Amino acid sequence: MNSLLMITACLFLIGTVWAKEGYLVNKSTGCKYECFWLGKNEFCDKECKAKNQGGSYGYCYSFACWCEGLPESTSTYPLPNKSCGRK
């Protein structure tokens, strides 16, 4: 019983530590969400935590919103076969 509990706890921690992270991307344009206030950023945090994104934390890094704790289903920059600003 203790072994099962330990295995479950380890799997949970692995999922938490290895959660997806990356730049939040606009699916229609292929561009990153821009921001100008580097570091802690209310806009980025709000966008990353939105229901359709599912992230746990967001901040402004290199003038774009970086998200942590994203589910695997959330798209991040770059999108395959879609370049920002190009058709």
From Swiss-Prot:
Main subcellular location of this protein, as a coarse class: secreted
Entries under SMART domains matching the protein: Knot1
GO molecular function, one term: sodium channel inhibitor activity
Propeptide feature: residues: 85-87
Cystine pairs: C31-C84, C35-C60, C44-C65, C48-C67
Expressed in which tissues: Expressed by the venom gland.
Localization of this protein: Secreted
SUPFAM superfamilies in the cross-refs: Scorpion toxin-like (SSF57095)
InterPro entries linked: LCN-type_CS_alpha_beta_dom, Scorpion_toxin-like, Scorpion_toxin-like_sf, Scorpion_toxinL, Scorpion_toxinL/defensin
Secretion signal span: 1-19
Residues forming coiled coils: none
Keyword Disulfide bond: yes
Key words of the record: Amidation, Disulfide bond, Ion channel impairing toxin, Neurotoxin, Secreted, Signal, Toxin, Voltage-gated sodium channel impairing toxin
GO cellular component: extracellular region
Keyword Isomerase appears in the UniProt entry: no
GO annotation terms (biological process): defense response
Top-level taxonomic group: Eukaryota
Residues modified to Cysteine amide: C84
Start and end residues of each LCN-type CS-alpha/beta domain: 20-85
Similarity-based family: Belongs to the long (4 C-C) scorpion toxin superfamily. Sodium channel inhibitor family. Beta subfamily.
Function: Beta toxins bind voltage-independently at site-4 of sodium channels (Nav) and shift the voltage of activation toward more negative potentials thereby affecting sodium channel activation and promoting spontaneous and repetitive firing.
Domain notes: Has the structural arrangement of an alpha-helix connected to antiparallel beta-sheets by disulfide bonds (CS-alpha/beta).
Protein name per the record: Neurotoxin Cex4
Organism of origin: Centruroides exilicauda
